[in-house]
Regions:
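Glycine/Thr-rich phosphate-binding loops of Rossmann-like dinucleotide-binding domains
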Residues: 17, 63-64, 87
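Short, polar loop motifs at secondary-structure junctions
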Residues: 42-43, 58-62
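Conserved acidic residues
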Residues: 52
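Ser/Thr/Gly-rich flexible loops in soluble cytosolic domains mediating phosphotransfer, phosphorylation
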Residues: 74-103
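Short, conserved catalytic or adaptor-binding loops enriched in Gly and charged residues
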Residues: 66-71
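A short, aliphatic-rich alpha-helical micro-motif
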Residues: 47-49
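Conserved active-site segments centered on acidic
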Residues: 2-45
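Structural signal for conserved beta-strand scaffold positions within catalytic alpha/beta enzyme cores
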Residues: 40, 56, 77-79
């Protein structure tokens, strides 16, 4: 990997589920030897964040569609199960390859 990926985990309050998703994603990153900067925030803060990938629960999709997030700069991954390492890996790895964070 040529550069460190910046991942942002988002939930309503920026505390519970976003932190749980962050912990599950750390396992996936470690397993795949991916270096990343991780943070978790509430949904209102996420709109103005400068990150490579936002990871959030599927139930926030309608709210994110209202934000003006540049898809060229930031990919958004919606999860059905925010603590499923399998789902995180299945959705995150292709995005990282597409965005040239992985070969």
């Amino acid at each position: 990997m040529s550069k460190q990926v910046k991942l942002l985990f988002v939930c309503g309050a920026g505390l519970g589920s976003s932190f749980a998703a962050q912990m599950a994603t750390e396992e996936v990153l470690n397993k795949n030897n991916i270096k990343a900067k991780l943070d978790h925030v509430d949904i209102s803060t996420a709109a103005s964040s400068n990150v490579d990938v936002i990871i959030t629960a599927q139930n926030f999709q309608k709210q994110f569609e209202k934000f003006n997030i540049d898809s060229e700069k930031t990919s958004i991954i919606y999860l059905k199960n925010i603590v499923s390492e399998k789902e995180i890996e299945e959705k995150l790895i292709p995005v990282l390859k597409e965005r040239k964070f992985l070969d």
